C-alpha cells in the first residue's frame, strides 16, 4: 500500500518537472525558438487557435523565425496575435510570410528573464512539495487505519522525502542551465 503511494507521488513529481520544462521553453533566450509561440492564440474565424496549427514555423538562422501560414488570408491575424501576446517581438509581414528577428537581449532584459525563470522554478518546487505533503497525508491515513506500522510510516515518509529532494534538485539544475543560456552573450 505504501509503495503505491510513493509510486503515485513520484509520477506526480515527474509531471511537475515536465510541466516546468515546457514552461521554460516559452521563455526567450538569445536564440530564436519556435516554442516561444506555443502560447500564442490567433482568433481564426472566431475560434482561438494556436499559431502552430495555422502555420509552418521555421528557424532558418539563430536569430530569425519565419512563419508561413497555411492560409495566406490569416497572415494579418497571426501578426496581430503575436503583437498582442506581448513577447517583446516585432513581426514583419511581407504578404506571404511573417519574419520575426530576435534582437540581442539587453543586460536589463536578461536579468528580467532570469527572474522569470526563478519564479517558474519556485512554482515547480512548490508543486513538488505539495505532492510530498499529499503523499505523507495519505500514508498517515493508512497508518491511522491500521494498514501499516509506525516504522513503515517513517520509512515511507523518508522515501517520499528522498524523491522530493531528487526532483527539486532536477528543477534547480534545469533552472541553472536556462539562466546560463539567458546570460550568454
From Swiss-Prot:
| The organism's place on the tree of life at top rank | Bacteria
Q: Name one GO biological process term.
A: translational termination
For this protein, the record's CDD domains field holds: RRF (cd00520)
State the GO CC annotations.
Answer: cytoplasm
The entry's keywords: Cytoplasm, Protein biosynthesis
Q: Where in the cell is it found?
A: Cytoplasm
Record keywords: Protein biosynthesis included? Answer: yes
Q: Which InterPro entries match?
A: Ribosome_recyc_fac (IPR002661), Ribosome_recyc_fac_dom (IPR023584), RRF_sf (IPR036191)
GO MF terms on file? ribosomal large subunit binding
Q: Which residues form a coiled coil?
A: none
State the PANTHER family in the record.
MITOCHONDRIAL RIBOSOME RECYCLING FACTOR PSEUDO 1, RIBOSOME RECYCLING FACTOR
Give the protein family: Belongs to the RRF family.
Outline what the protein does: Responsible for the release of ribosomes from messenger RNA at the termination of protein biosynthesis. May increase the efficiency of translation by recycling ribosomes from one round of translation to another.
Name-wise, this protein is: Ribosome-recycling factor
The organism of origin for this protein: Bacillus cytotoxicus (strain DSM 22905 / CIP 110041 / 391-98 / NVH 391-98)
Organism lineage reads as: Bacteria, Bacillati, Bacillota, Bacilli, Bacillales
Amino acid at each position: 500500500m505504501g509503495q503505491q503511494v510513493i509510486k503515485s507521488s513520484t509520477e506526480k513529481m515527474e509531471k511537475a518537472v515536465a510541466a516546468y520544462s515546457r514552461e521554460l521553453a516559452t521563455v526567450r533566450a538569445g536564440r530564436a525558438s519556435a516554442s516561444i509561440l506555443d502560447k500564442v492564440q490567433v482568433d481564426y474565424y472566431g475560434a482561438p487557435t494556436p499559431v502552430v496549427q495555422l502555420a509552418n514555423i521555421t528557424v532558418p538562422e539563430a536569430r530569425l523565425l519565419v512563419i508561413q501560414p497555411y492560409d495566406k488570408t490569416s497572415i494579418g491575424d497571426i501578426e496581430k496575435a503575436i503583437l498582442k501576446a506581448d513577447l517583446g517581438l516585432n513581426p514583419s509581414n511581407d504578404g506571404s510570410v511573417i519574419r520575426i528577428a530576435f534582437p540581442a537581449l539587453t543586460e536589463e532584459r536578461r536579468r528580467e528573464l532570469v527572474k522569470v525563470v526563478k519564479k517558474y522554478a519556485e512554482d515547480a518546487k512548490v508543486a513538488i512539495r505539495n505532492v510530498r505533503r499529499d503523499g505523507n497525508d495519505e500514508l498517515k491515513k493508512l497508518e491511522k487505519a491500521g494498514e501499516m506500522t509506525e516504522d513503515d510510516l517513517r520509512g515511507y515518509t523518508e522515501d517520499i522525502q528522498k524523491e522530493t529532494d531528487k526532483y527539486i534538485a532536477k528543477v534547480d539544475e534545469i533552472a541553472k542551465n536556462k539562466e546560463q543560456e539567458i546570460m550568454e552573450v
